Amino acid sequence: MISPFIVNDKNLFLSRFPVSQVNRSLQAWDSADEYLINHVHDQNLINAQTKVAIFNDAFGALAVNFCQSTSENPEVISINDSYISSEGASYNIEQNSLDDSHFTQLNSLDSLPNNIDVILYKIPKSKSLLIEQLIQIKKSVNENCIFIAADRAKEIHSSTLKVFEKHLGTTKTSLAVKKARLVFCQFDNKQVHQSPFPTVWSIPHKSTNDLPSRELTISNHANVYAREKLDIGARYFIENLPTVAANSTVIDLGCGNGVIGLTVLANQPEAHVQFIDESTMAISSAKQNIMTNLPDVIEQCEFTLNDSLTDIEGGSVDLILCNPPFHQNTATTDHIAWQMFKDSHRVLKKGGELRIIGNQKLAYHIKLQRLFGNETLIASNDKFVTQSAIKR
């Protein structure tokens, strides 16, 4: 849905990304974006000499408001872990014919620039990402930097404020407006806390062929799910992976830390595996885990930041393994799974297999039947179901 975004007398149009998604009813901005933008303008915090850092801007709602086609543009740096969010910001700036000459995008693992004057911070869903970003911010800014965070009021708890207080300094909140709230932090001169990320832990691997069993060492950046142990869904999926032939082309779609693709390669070192995710931290974690555990097969691996399987050649892959996410930012939606399934059908060779795991209540078998014309139940328990579909 293209949403008219009228704030501070600026009439802009924002689209949620990807623009082709099935569920187009979700808008690309929220009341926290409005509140934050209005506060910045009311307080005259930004001018042409200001260096502004924007964190976790879902689809560019904040960026487009500071990339106006005038000579008074501030320098705007957007920092995001999400490839989709970054692409959404670029798309919306272009669609509104805005000046991006003072606009730069960084990923979540890039070093932050020095001399930032104002930080506009959308609070992420992940507490671990929040902690990691605050630690990196504290390392990079001086005490005079203005820091304002925003989120829905119901998501800002006393525990959230304690995290800001611990890592940045004195923390205060605004009144709620349209169910959104702002958080103001004054940087103190206390020592920066040491980052606990990436976390490192081990899992046992029992080979399904004649290779010896071994321990696998897993490294997880802050924004990667299951940071300290193998989650129960991944464990169940690993127990029900198919046998992979030598020289097979495999995609670990939505790979996270890459443990599924890593398991495939531990069982079949002659497979070719592409790890795909939209999170910079996920792709970095997956690559590190191959380098740590199976460095000899790194040449058989690709690591790709992508929106599902966009631009992957059709009819080119033997097997796709996927645990589809059902959240995009704070929204619960099934359009990501639907896109992944459609893309998988296009990318698979004839006779190729899509194997997925999902929560029982998500009823993915209906979508698989609709797309592939077939679906096989591989295994199920009280919570999860593993299913397979073959491209005919």
UniProtKB/Swiss-Prot annotation:
Recorded name of the encoding gene: rlmG
Pfam families from the UniProt entry: MTS (PF05175)
Entry's Gene Ontology cellular component terms: cytoplasm
SUPFAM superfamilies: S-adenosyl-L-methionine-dependent methyltransferases (SSF53335)
Name listed for the protein in its UniProt record: Ribosomal RNA large subunit methyltransferase G
Superkingdom per UniProt: Bacteria
Gene3D superfamilies in UniProt: Vaccinia Virus protein VP39 (3.40.50.150)
GO molecular function terms listed in the Swiss-Prot or TrEMBL record: 23S rRNA (guanine(1835)-N(2))-methyltransferase activity; nucleic acid binding
UniProt EC number: 2.1.1.174
Family annotation (PANTHER family): RIBOSOMAL RNA LARGE SUBUNIT METHYLTRANSFERASE G (PTHR47816:SF5), RIBOSOMAL RNA SMALL SUBUNIT METHYLTRANSFERASE C (PTHR47816)
Predominant location: cytoplasm
Catalytic activity line of the entry: guanosine(1835) in 23S rRNA + S-adenosyl-L-methionine = N(2)-methylguanosine(1835) in 23S rRNA + S-adenosyl-L-homocysteine + H(+)
InterPro entries found in the cross-reference section: DNA_methylase_N6_adenine_CS, rRNA_m2G-MeTrfase_RlmG, RsmC/RlmG, SAM-dependent_MTases_sf, Small_mtfrase_dom
Subcellular location: Cytoplasm
Keywords: Cytoplasm, Methyltransferase, rRNA processing, S-adenosyl-L-methionine, Transferase
Similarity section: Belongs to the methyltransferase superfamily. RlmG family.
Enzyme class: transferase
Function comment: Specifically methylates the guanine in position 1835 (m2G1835) of 23S rRNA.
Origin species: Colwellia psychrerythraea (strain 34H / ATCC BAA-681) (Vibrio psychroerythus)
Cytoplasm as UniProt keyword: yes
